[in-house]
């Protein structure tokens, strides 16, 4: 299957996608003997892809890797940052940070914590981030203030965001007092900063946001707790379940 060249180079562990774009612009990448342009696509099973004159073969692709990370606060959900801030790849050992093509699937904003999937499986990433597949994700949300029952029902039923109504959500009140409330929120879509923006629409402030689960993936499983900043490899059963939810074998 033909894919954008910068994506292939990232999946092959040659460079991050941003660096791969720079390599293409610098004329260092060729497809079938011709210098590639940004936006070009290639099929590694059919095309000859070269970097600095060295051919990249289809069987050079690293094995598929699937990791679950418990992202701490103040860590970016990206592969690299031009300002030198800490990213989720910095949480991994050196042998996983480079050369494997790992990237986060979706994002948690800088101030949010919790479950984040990292993989180099491009097809799985594409499906998990496609609006067609409504993979449920569950969050602990601490809010300043006390929303009314009517506000919570609005959130559950769906609210307008960027001119489009959000999908229904599940909200469970865990605890509350006169100053704040702790909710368990399950979403089946992933719009940019969705929980924080919906809270703002209701006049509420998010004090803390922590993602517990991504589909079948849980931070706490098999009697073990994945601590902040730690990661683990997914089990074969978890990989199968995750792929099944997006119709991928």
UniProtKB/Swiss-Prot annotation:
Q: Which CDD domains match?
A: PseudoU_synth_RsuA_like (cd02870), S4 (cd00165)
The GO biological-process annotations, alphabetized, read as: enzyme-directed rRNA pseudouridine synthesis
Name the reaction it catalyses: a uridine in RNA = a pseudouridine in RNA
Q: Does the keyword Transmembrane helix apply?
A: no
EC numbers: 5.4.99.-
- NCBIfam families reported for this sequence: pseudouridine synthase (TIGR00093)
* Protein's recorded name: Uncharacterized RNA pseudouridine synthase slr0361
């Amino acid at each position: 299957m033909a894919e954008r060249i910068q994506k292939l180079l990232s999946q092959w562990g040659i460079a991050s996608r941003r660096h791969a774009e720079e390599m293409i612009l610098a004329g260092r990448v060729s497809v079938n003997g011709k210098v590639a342009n940004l936006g070009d696509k290639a099929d590694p099973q059919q095309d000859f892809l070269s970097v600095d004159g060295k051919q990249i073969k289809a069987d050079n692709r690293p094995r598929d890797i699937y990791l679950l990370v418990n992202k701490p606060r103040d860590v970016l959900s990206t592969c690299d940052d031009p300002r030198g801030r800490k990213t989720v790849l910095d949480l991994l050992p050196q042998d996983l940070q480079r050369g494997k093509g790992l990237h986060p699937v979706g994002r948690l904003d800088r101030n949010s914590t919790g479950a984040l999937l990292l993989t180099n499986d491009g097809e799985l990433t594409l499906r998990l981030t496609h609006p067609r597949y409504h993979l449920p994700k569950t969050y602990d949300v601490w809010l300043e203030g006390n929303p009314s029952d009517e506000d919570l029902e609005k959130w559950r039923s769906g609210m307008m965001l960027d001119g489009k109504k959000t999908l229904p959500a599940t909200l469970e009140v865990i605890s509350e007092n006169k100053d704040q409330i702790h909710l368990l929120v399950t979403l089946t879509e992933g719009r940019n900063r969705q929980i924080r923006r919906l809270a703002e629409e209701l006049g509420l402030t998010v004090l803390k946001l922590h993602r517990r689960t991504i589909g079948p993936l849980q931070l706490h499983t098999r009697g073990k707790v994945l601590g902040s900043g730690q990661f683990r490899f997914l089990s074969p059963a978890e990989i199968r379940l995750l792929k099944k939810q997006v119709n991928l074998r």
